[in-house]
Regions:
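A cross-taxon signal for low-complexity, glycine/charged-rich
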Residues: 274-290, 295-297, 301-305
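Asp-based, Mg2+/Mn2+-dependent phosphohydrolase catalytic module
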Residues: 2-9, 14-33, 44-69, 76-273, ...
Length: 305
C-alpha cells in the first residue's frame, strides 16, 4: 500500500512569510514521485485557492485548490452530512463563509440551527447576536479548538477556540469542535487523499509540528505521525505526553531523499537519538491511566523583537 501524506502548514512548510528550508524540495519530491498529499490546516479564514496562491508567492508552484483541506471545509462537510437543511449564524471571515455558501447552507441571524465560529470578525455586536441565538436554541459549533492564531513573529490574535470559549462561558452551553484533532477532520482528509490517489487506498501519515492537534489527531485516527521540530514543539516537550509521534524529524527536508528513493532514513528516528535527548526511554514516554491526562493547551510562540 502506497503512503500518502497529510501535511500541516504553519511551522511545517512556512513560518510567517518564509518557507522553511527544504520545504519546496519536499513538495517537489512528492509531486515528481506521484505521492498523494493533502495540506491540512485548522485556519478557517483562507480558502484553498488563497492557500495555493500563498504557497506560489513563497516559491512552491503547481498546486491547486484540491491539495488543501481546511477546518472551514470540514465544517461545511459536517453540516452537509449531518444536517443538510440547517441554517447558521457565522462569526468568521473568508474561507468559512465561502465553504458554507458553496454548500448552500443559509444564513439566519434570528433563529439559526447553529452558531458557527471561525477565525476573525468576533465583534461585540456579533458575539451578542450569537449569544442570543444560542439562548434561543442554536447549537454552538467551532471550526477548530485553537485559542490563538499567529499574525507575525511578535503578534497573535484570538482563534476560533477562544471565541467559542467566550460563548460557552456566557451561555453555559458546550461547543462541538471540528478541525484537528477531531476524528471527523481526519476521516474526511483520508477520503480526500484517496480521491487524489484516484481511488487507491493509502497508508496515511500526518506530518505536523503540534502535539495537541496534529499528533493527537493522528493517534486517535490510527495514523502514523511525523513530528517536525521546525515549528511550535521542542524535543524536550515530548516527555509531557503519553501519545507519541511515530517519528521525529528536524524538518520536512529530512524526508526528501526518502521520498525520492523509497528508502526510509533512520537518522532522526533512532532510539539512541531519543534516549540521549530525554530521560525515561523513548521520547520520555510515561505510563498514565488516562491516556490524555497530560494534554496541555497549545504553547504560545516565543515573541521576538
Amino acid at each position: 500500500m502506497k503512503t500518502g501524506y497529510l501535511i500541516d502548514m504553519d511551522g511545517v512548510i512556512y513560518r510567517e512569510n518564509h518557507l522553511i528550508p527544504g520545504a519546496a524540495d519536499f513538495v517537489q519530491a512528492l509531486t515528481t514521485n506521484g505521492t498523494p498529499f493533502l495540506f491540512l490546516t485548522n485556519n478557517s479564514a483562507p480558502t484553498p485557492e488563497d492557500l495555493a496562491v500563498r504557497l506560489k508567492h513563497l516559491g512552491i508552484h503547481g498546486l491547486s485548490a484540491r491539495h488543501f483541506y481546511t477546518s472551514a471545509l470540514n465544517t461545511a462537510d459536517f453540516l452537509s452530512e449531518t444536517d443538510p437543511s440547517c441554517t447558521v449564524f457565522v462569526i468568521g471571515e473568508g474561507g468559512i463563509l465561502t465553504a458554507l455558501h458553496e454548500r448552500k447552507i443559509a444564513n439566519d441571524a434570528i433563529r439559526p440551527s447553529y452558531v458557527v465560529v471561525g477565525e476573525g470578525a468576533a465583534t461585540t455586536e456579533k458575539l451578542t447576536k450569537a449569544h442570543v441565538c444560542i439562548e434561543r436554541g442554536a447549537r454552538l459549533l467551532a471550526t477548530n479548538p485553537d485559542n490563538w492564531c499567529p499574525v507575525s513573529s511578535d503578534k497573535t490574535r484570538p482563534g476560533a477556540g477562544a471565541t467559542a470559549a467566550f460563548l460557552e462561558a456566557s451561555t453555559g452551553r458546550r461547543a462541538y469542535y471540528l478541525g484537528k484533532p477531531n476524528g471527523y477532520m481526519f476521516h474526511r482528509a483520508r477520503q480526500k487523499l484517496t480521491e487524489l490517489a484516484l481511488g487507491q487506498p493509502q497508508q496515511g501519515v500526518m506530518i505536523g509540528d503540534t502535539m495537541e492537534t496534529d499528533i493527537r489527531g493522528a493517534f486517535e485516527a490510527g495514523l502514523q505521525s511525523f513530528l517536525v521540530l521546525s515549528g511550535s514543539t521542542r524535543l524536550e516537550m515530548l516527555g509531557d505526553y503519553v501519545y507519541q509521534p511515530t517519528r521525529v524529524l528536524q524538518s520536512v527536508a529530512d524526508l526528501v531523499a526518502e521520498i525520492k528513493t523509497g528508502k526510509p532514513s533512520d537518522r532522526m528516528n533512532s532510539p539512541a537519538f531519543a534516549e540521549r535527548t530525554l530521560p525515561g526511554g523513548r521520547f520520555g514516554q510515561r505510563h498514565q491511566t488516562d491516556v490524555f491526562a497530560l494534554h496541555k493547551p497549545r504553547p504560545r510562540p516565543a515573541m521576538t523583537k
